[in-house]
Amino acid sequence: MNFKYIVAVSILIASAYARREENNIQSLSQRDVLEEESLREIRGIGASILSAGKSALKGFAKGLAEHFANGKRTAEDHEMMKRLEAAVRDLDSLEHPEEASEKETRGFNQEEKEKRIIGPVLGLVGSALGGLLKKIG
């Protein structure tokens, strides 16, 4: 009779352990789903902010291009315009997606392009504004 109780208690303990493990797994998968949803929301917000920034930057670059096109350019102005044109081309390439099968690669490449573009473009914008302020002042 003691053997039956030992077996019954062992089965109860094993089933309780199995239920607890199953609940832990479900809890982890629910957390993963919530984290993934949060990341998607953050990426969506970041993409919209980046898109607005790209549009503003492209408008600014085009305005600078028109300003420099109407006047005489020095070699420094010419070099700055070349860099701005390259930055605008890179920004345009970010907006045109490739094939759907290359989606993951495109995401990685887009992040790399954004990293490569943002630093130099901010420097160019700063130097362009500084140059304009010098000419105006």
Swiss-Prot record:
Family (UniProt): Belongs to the bombinin family.
Asparagine amide modification, residue list: 70
Main subcellular location: secreted
Localization in the cell: Secreted
Official protein name in the record: Bombinin-like peptides 2
Disulfide bonds: none
Recorded GO CC terms: extracellular region
Chain's role: Bombinin-like peptide 2 has antimicrobial activity, but no hemolytic activity. Preliminary evidence indicates that this peptide does not lyse and thus kill the bacteria by its antimicrobial activity.
